[in-house]
Amino acid sequence: MSHTPTPAAGSGHAPANGHMALVIGAIGVVFGDIGTSPLYTLKEAFSPHYGLTSDHDTVLGVLSLAFWALMITVTLKYVTIIMRADNEGEGGIMALMALTQRTLKQGSRSAYVVGILGIFGASLFFGDGVITPAISVMGAVEGLEIAAPSLHPFIVPITVVVLLVVFMVQRFGTEKVGKVFGPITCLWFLSLGAIGIWNIVDAPEVLKAFNPWWAIRFFMEHGWHGVFILGAVVLAVTGGEALYADMGHFGARPIRHGWYFFVLPMLLLNYLGQGALVLNHPAALKNPFFEAVPSWALYPMIILATLAAVIASQAVITGAYSVARQAMQLGYIPRMLIKHTSRDTIGQIYVPGINWLLMVMVIALVLIFRSSTNLAVAYGISVSMTMLIDTLLLALVARSLWPRWRNWVLPLCVVFFIIELAFVIANGAKLLQGAWFPLALGIVVFTLMRTWRRGRALLREEIRKDGIRIDSFLPGLMLAPPARVPGMAVFLTADPMVVPHALMHNLKHNKVLHERNIFLNVDTLPIPYAPADKRLQIESIGDEFYRVYVRFGFMETPDVPLALMRSCDQGGIHFDPMDTTFFASRETIVASANRGMPIWRDKLFALMHRNAAPATGFFRIPGNRLVELGAQVEI
């Protein structure tokens, strides 16, 4: 069903030992978010906010809803179907958007709508990324209340300290500690299953929740109020989208096997165990997860839950770095400083700007909401909307790329859409109670991304409009050629057909040309990694002038000097970094009320442009080989 063979790690038939290592690694990274959902899902479903009683039919109804949500949304949609919609092995909403746009006519209304959906979905991811660390860590630390109620005043301070440590150590990378994430998370899931079995033996009738009749009966008894309970049920599937987003790191097979044969059974056992406890001891509703733990294992379980929450937070934070890098490469957010934290693993990066923004917002959330129950009210809306967008994009992929399978995938997409629309409606009812926060954050990020994208387009238009075409400029220049100096000049340009401002300034003030001159355009392809045969394209335009295109995938960190060094000799240009000067224009944006965007967006774009990391640093151009020349552009 996949449109192309996927080169993602683990997608082939790896040796058994290697495959098992990938499965354990995936358990440590991919399933962290969904693995901490038992900490708060049933606790939220039976909170006073929803007014449910703990009678037999209601408990079985809620358990049945959670079971079928996991089976339909996570197992069927994400693990079985959508993970086949890979973009050269990569997953996630940005990769899915780029894949979908490749099936549509460039510049068409459909491509525009898909772009809007993808950007909004990525924006909502950051809302989810703020809440997940807060609710996971706080839900784990709240276990202390069960062990020692007198510790209640210390729950928030302890949560803040744990989160501060998590964010402060990001700059050191996770290469070393990441090796223990898998075993710790495996122990966490085994503990979930063991706790579940411990309680199920006391009330085995909870196994009847596998029958969908109990979910249907729940809606029949509770009517529209039953729909709103889905606002709590959706917490059981939060993190399901991470299985697809992290596919490029581990491959589809290890993630599928980890889910089918280990993670899903352990989660189901734990939810059923909590339900069994509630049937026998309704007072356990205050915190059914920790009440289900035997007293002798309570403190070890609190420690293990906190470690699992930290690992889940780590997965979301690194996921935010990855999405931010993809968005930068695809031109949706300003360039930011990216640091590599591993010499061996290219995907391990640290983005300081994203890290500190997340830290401030996560800690602010903890201080404002002060409990996992209050945070659960805010949770879910962004996840539900992201899942809904994934379904719409999946339908487009199935229609265009899967002719053999579309007749059964498209009807399933209708089922997914109805379920996820119900999740969105249920969470929308909590807007005033706190669900507004991730939605508002998503809208802010969406506005920033759209403003940056549109502003860059307007900037290119202005430069092109005021510029001189190279094909008409060079013949005139060669009629009275300026003096030539030894070496090579590389002029970075967004439009290689127009004379760069930096060249015009150099001629005006220095009145010289280098022996060899390159007009360099750096482009990002809508695929994760640029193939070697598309990495570099060289065109000779006469008199030792060359037009060079360097291309990268959206998962790559651009290194222009390295790309030139590896490829230029093949195109007949000798590239010596020590004999090359890079020239770049640094535009100053002047906002105008009479141009393409409202004045407030012009000013916002100017602010973002002013604070963006210079293209030269982003492209790894050495500062001692760089000349930057300013230019003022009105948009």
UniProtKB/Swiss-Prot annotation:
GO terms for cellular component: membrane; plasma membrane. InterPro entries: K+_transporter (IPR003855), K_trans_C (IPR053952), K_trans_N (IPR053951), Kup (IPR023051). It is found in: Cell inner membrane. It comes from the Bacteria. The keyword Cell membrane applies. GO terms for biological process: potassium ion transport. Coiled coil: none annotated. The chain crosses the membrane at residues 20-40, 62-82, 111-131, 149-169, 180-200, 223-243, 259-279, 292-312, 349-369, 377-397, 408-428, 429-449. GO terms for molecular function: potassium ion transmembrane transporter activity; symporter activity. It catalyses: K(+)(in) + H(+)(in) = K(+)(out) + H(+)(out). Transport of potassium into the cell. Likely operates as a K(+):H(+) symporter. This is Probable potassium transport system protein Kup. It comes from Xanthomonas campestris pv. campestris (strain ATCC 33913 / DSM 3586 / NCPPB 528 / LMG 568 / P 25).
